[in-house]
Amino acid sequence: MKTKAEHSIIADAIHEWHTVYLPCIRNLSHNALKSYGEGMGIYIDFLESSKGVTSNTICGECFRKDWIEEWIAWLKEVRKCSPQTCNHRLSILKNFLRFLAHKKIQFIKYDCDAAEIKRMQQPKKQVEVITKDTIKRIFASINTRTLIGKRDFALFNLLYSTGTRIDEILSLRLSALHLD
């Protein structure tokens, strides 16, 4: 019995991963699917432009740890991607390799090697603090003489005094309040 060529196995796996696994099993949104497809496409572009790999020559060796690390450096230096973008693209590739290893055990080495690749350090974002003066101006701008104004004042007061997120406040129901 003739075995299926490695490039064909990988091509079929990419197709199944993107058309069945991600949308049906993982239930990813349309935008997430687009992002995953772009991420995988960028890795394939890298293989073609930097390594001379074509759709007929793609193989397990194309997912070697050193090539993936080289790709991450390429993303940062050539494509000018931020650390967050590089980490996102790396997680997409790792996700595919995990899928591929589950489908065909012969690729498990590449999944294990990719799992060892560390994420790039991301700079901590500074939290923008609202000044007391700004808070006072927000409260002063609410017209508390109207019913809607009273509602808005109560909402802002609850948000400010508890530090609760708006979606948590909006999901509150009367039955959840205990005013005793």
What is each of the regions a protein language model found here?
Residues 1-180:
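Conserved catalytic core of the tyrosine transesterase superfamily
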